[in-house]
Regions:
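Active-site-adjacent "subsite" loops/lids of carbohydrate-active enzymes
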Residues: 114-127, 194-247
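Catalytic domains of carbohydrate-active enzymes, especially glycoside hydrolases
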Residues: 131-157, 251-255, 348-354, 405-411
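Aromatic-lined substrate-binding rim segments of carbohydrate-active enzymes
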Residues: 136-137, 154-203, 298-318
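Glycine-rich, aromatic-flanked loop segments that form ligand/cofactor-binding clefts
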Residues: 149, 177-219, 256-264
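Aromatic- and acidic-residue-enriched carbohydrate-binding clefts of CAZyme catalytic domains
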Residues: 155-178, 204-229, 268-301
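Aromatic-lined carbohydrate-recognition surfaces of secreted/lumenal glycan-active proteins
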Residues: 194-198, 255-264, 293-340, 382-393
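Substrate-binding cleft/loops of secretory-pathway carbohydrate-active enzymes
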Residues: 266, 323-364
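Substrate-binding cleft of secreted/luminal carbohydrate-active enzymes
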Residues: 351-370, 380-424
Length: 424
């Protein structure tokens, strides 16, 4: 049914869609070229005394095989999900790319290369002209930071030009502040730059409420549902933004970070149910004897697969630019991830280059944060980039955590606006 609330002329919308499609197609074409160059870099760095891809190495990217699992040990729904995961998709190429990236990270670790990153939020990047980026870079380098992560906005209000969707751009037509900021940061000693893309699309979800996630308790969330990640317009909007960032900045950045993409106690919308039925063959959601919705292992397997499938799609559009996925943490069982949020770490690491766990702890709980980071690093060496948050922890507390993580190869501190004494 046509959306009668949309005032954009059909021909303009069609032209915009064609432009977006061309951007996506160009990103896909470049993927093959860029991944080959990255693989060559890895091969040139290879140390013959270092064995990376040993059998059983947790860092090796291996797609699950339905044949390798005993059919008798799986329920019919799990058998169908396993077959769905094993179906050839563009993710096969993505898996090859992230495996090459993982090997490069392990080689960097072996060489003693570390990443100490600062997350700079929208509050600063949206006011780029009012910030002294040379001074920001010099202060960061002086305190041992070598990487800056810059907020690039959300698909609905971007800090980058998007010709297909000028209505979503928060800039004047000739402005390109992020490119200027990146040049200044690099000129003043910052070695690596990442752009962070927030996946919240509140305005679009208000326009298309049928694509909102609905938690197990019935709460309607301002987040895209699993089904929304498989269908237009939400899927195209989110993935299109990733493709646009890669196309516009891929030559000058080291990666793209996807943030704010998760669910709370799953998602059980009507559109989700249609998708669940199609994927699993089940007639309804899992329920208890009294009819209450349940997050069974089969359900969480489905939920996390939908998230990983979407991230694989995004990664396939980056033209070889590494993709980092922000994830929630499980304090009680760190390696279990957060399947209720759609975050199965092992699945995500088949299609994303790294995960960035939100290690947002309270002051006084530094040891808990340190233990979690080392547990994740041990399981997935070279693939974990923890973010220490300053929302509930003081700069002094995060300083203690950083000292305890001295041997960790990758750590981010966020946000810059709250770092205070950490930069003095």
């Amino acid at each position: 049914m046509p959306n009668t609330n949309d005032t954009q002329p059909t021909n303009e919308r069609t032209r915009a869609q064609v432009t977006t499609a061309r951007t996506v197609a160009e990103a896909a074409r470049k993927t093959g070229e860029k991944v080959q160059s990255r693989i060559i870099i890895v091969e040139n760095l290879a140390d013959t005394s270092l064995v990376i891809d040993q059998a059983g190495d947790p860092n090796t990217v291996v797609e699950p095989s339905a044949e390798a699992l005993s059919a008798a040990a799986l329920s019919p729904i799990m058998q169908r999900l396993a077959a769905l995961e094993a179906t050839p998709t563009p993710a096969a190429t993505v898996a090859e790319q992230v495996q090459a990236s993982a090997r490069l990270n392990r080689l960097a670790d072996h060489a003693g290369i570390t990443t100490r990153a600062i997350g700079i939020g929208w509050e600063d990047t949206s006011n780029a002209a009012r910030r002294n980026w040379s001074e920001i870079a010099r202060a960061a380098v002086t305190r041992g930071y070598n990487t800056i992560d810059l907020a690039a906005g959300r698909p609905e209000w971007t800090l980058f030009q998007w010709p297909a969707h000028p209505e979503w751009v928060s800039l004047e037509p000739q402005e390109n502040p992020l490119r200027d900021v990146i040049a200044t940061l690099r000129a003043n000693g910052i070695e690596k730059i990442y752009l962070t893309l927030d996946m919240m699309v509140s305005t679009s979800l208000a326009k298309f409420p049928e694509w909102k996630a609905i938690s197990r308790d019935g709460t309607i969330r301002n987040m895209p549902s699993p089904a929304a990640l498989t269908r237009s317009p939400i899927r195209d909007m989110l993935a299109g933004a990733v493709a646009q960032v890669a196309a516009q900045f891929g030559d000058i950045i080291d990666g793209i970070i996807i943030t704010e993409l998760f669910w709370d106690s799953g998602s059980f919308s009507d559109n989700d149910l249609l998708l669940y039925r199609s994927d699993t063959g089940a007639p309804d959601w899992p329920r208890s004897e009294d009819g209450a919705l349940q997050e069974t292992p089969e359900y969480r397997e489905w939920l996390t697969t939908k998230m990983a499938d979407f991230i694989a799609h995004c990664r396939s559009l980056t033209a070889g630019v590494p993709l980092v996925m922000d994830v929630r943490v499980n304090w009680n069982q760190p390696l279990a991830g957060r399947p209720d949020s759609g975050h199965d770490y092992a699945k995500l690491l088949r299609v994303a280059d790294e995960i960035q766990p939100w290690v947002y702890y309270d002051t006084g709980e530094e040891s808990k944060a340190i233990a979690l980071v080392y547990a994740l690093n041990k399981q997935w060496p070279g693939r974990v980039r923890p973010a220490l948050g300053l929302w509930s922890a003081t700069p002094a507390s995060v300083g203690k955590a950083l000292a305890g993580l001295a041997t960790a190869h990758r750590v981010q501190v966020t946000p810059y606006s709250k770092m205070g004494t950490l930069l003095r």
